[in-house]
A protein has these predicted regions:
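Catalytic core of non-heme Fe(II) oxygenases with the double-stranded beta-helix
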Residues: 102-175
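Anionic coordination/interaction segments
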Residues: 1-16, 20-23, 27-42, 203
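Signature of the catalytic double-stranded beta-helix
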Residues: 31, 35-116, 122
Length: 219
């Protein structure tokens, strides 16, 4: 995964609107079901579990087995009692970002509570180029992935505020090194928004992706 520095003030302006979900986490707690509540994250982000998932080979479908957090996407959100502000804010922010990035699909819009996590997995079921934005108010969280070159886990620690990373998540038809086994964990409220581009994009499509990345890094 490649870190992308966010310098574009227009993009930051849209992302800053999304901080509403962190600022209003009590609203989420009151109205939404928390996925993976009372799950101890330590097992699911451990080296032992990572090894188990890798050794499963293609028996691992690609999905994370478990995670803790609030899924905000309309097809994933689970209400305890409906609140119109939550989908309204999602629609507004998602639409602006999709237009800006020329993306067709919002893959993830997820809010993690303290001690929230995403278990080791590889997304082989949804191979694509991923543009991933993470907000952490204190930086006390991380994204970890298996580095095939060193055969070790590498952690990309969150920055205070917004950060971005970009990379290709491979499938089982690709070389092993294209499989990105990864997990995430946080000790504070944290959110991740991601958009995907076609894994089999044309040269023109890949050039467009690079233009998007350049735009994110432009002042």
């Amino acid at each position: 995964m490649t870190p992308i520095e966010i310098k574009n003030q227009d993009i930051l302006g849209i992302l800053n609107k999304a901080e509403w979900f962190i600022d209003n986490h009590k609203l989420l707690e009151d109205h939404l079901h928390l996925n993976g509540s009372n799950v101890d994250y330590t097992k699911w982000v451990s080296e032992e579990y990572k090894t188990k998932v890798i050794e499963e080979g293609q028996a691992h479908e690609g999905y994370p087995v478990t995670a803790t957090g609030f899924s905000i996407k309309p097809e994933q959100i689970k209400y305890k009692k409906f609140n119109e502000e939550i989908p309204k804010m999602y629609d507004e922010i998602n639409q602006e970002l999709m237009v800006y990035f020329g993306a067709r699909h919002n893959a993830l819009f997820h809010v993690y509570p303290p001690n929230g996590f995403l278990s080791w997995h590889n997304n082989a079921n949804a191979s694509s180029y991923n543009l991933i934005f993470t907000y952490n108010p204190t930086g006390d969280g991380y994204f970890a992935y298996h580095d095939w070159e060193t055969n070790r886990t590498k952690k990309m620690y969150d920055k205070v505020g917004w950060s971005c990373k970009y990379g290709y998540f491979g499938n089982y038809k690709d070389a092993r090194e294209k499989l990105v086994y990864h997990c995430a964990q946080t000790n504070v409220w944290r959110m991740t928004i991601s958009y995907i581009y076609n894994a089999y994009d044309t040269d023109i499509g890949k050039e467009f992706q690079q233009q998007v990345i350049n735009e994110i890094m432009s002042e």
